[in-house]
A protein has these predicted regions:
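Hydrophobic membrane-insertion alpha-helices, especially the h-region
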Residues: 9-27
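Soluble "head" domains of membrane/secretory-pathway proteins
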Residues: 2-8, 23, 30-33, 40-147
Length: 147
């Protein structure tokens, strides 16, 4: 094979690699930077989360999944934890989560961090009390750091 053909072949292979890599990391595997402390201590400010854009079906979302949402109000992506699914009634009372009347232990929350944070910020509640019923097209998300 002539030198010119080798250069052309190499250039085409390199171009194909660049094209596949670009498509993969802009349309299929999307890196998202965590901005702020709202998911601490599970995720830290500036951590990178990888999103598989091919599996972004809303019906695949499960309770307590960590999700990336496009926040139009802030004009950026946000990382949060799914607490409520369509139709759920959520109640937080005295730092306890009830979903449709059933108590759920939020095992993903760091109990030591919560105890220290309550002392540091001189508060009795880590999650403010509330009650909400979701519509059939809504999910409810919270960060893991609720102070």
């Amino acid at each position: 094979m002539s030198k010119k053909k080798e250069v052309i072949k190499f250039s085409l292979q390199l171009l194909a690699i660049v094209a596949v890599t670009t498509v993969t990391f802009t349309k299929i595997i999307i890196p998202v930077r965590v901005d702020g402390q709202s998911m601490y201590p599970t995720l830290h400010d500036e951590d990178i989360a990888i999103v598989n854009a091919l599996s972004l079906e809303r019906s695949d979302i499960k309770r307590f999944d960590i999700v990336v949402l496009k926040c139009e109000k802030l004009d950026k992506d946000i990382v949060k934890r799914v607490i409520g699914l369509p139709g759920d009634t959520l109640v937080y009372r005295d730092d306890k989560l009830y979903i449709n009347g059933t108590y759920y232990d939020e095992k993903y929350l760091n109990k030591d961090y919560i105890a220290k944070a309550k002392i540091k910020y001189q508060t009795e509640l880590f999650t403010n009390d509330f009650e909400i019923t979701l519509n059939d097209d809504e999910i409810f998300v919270l960060g893991d750091n609720r102070l």
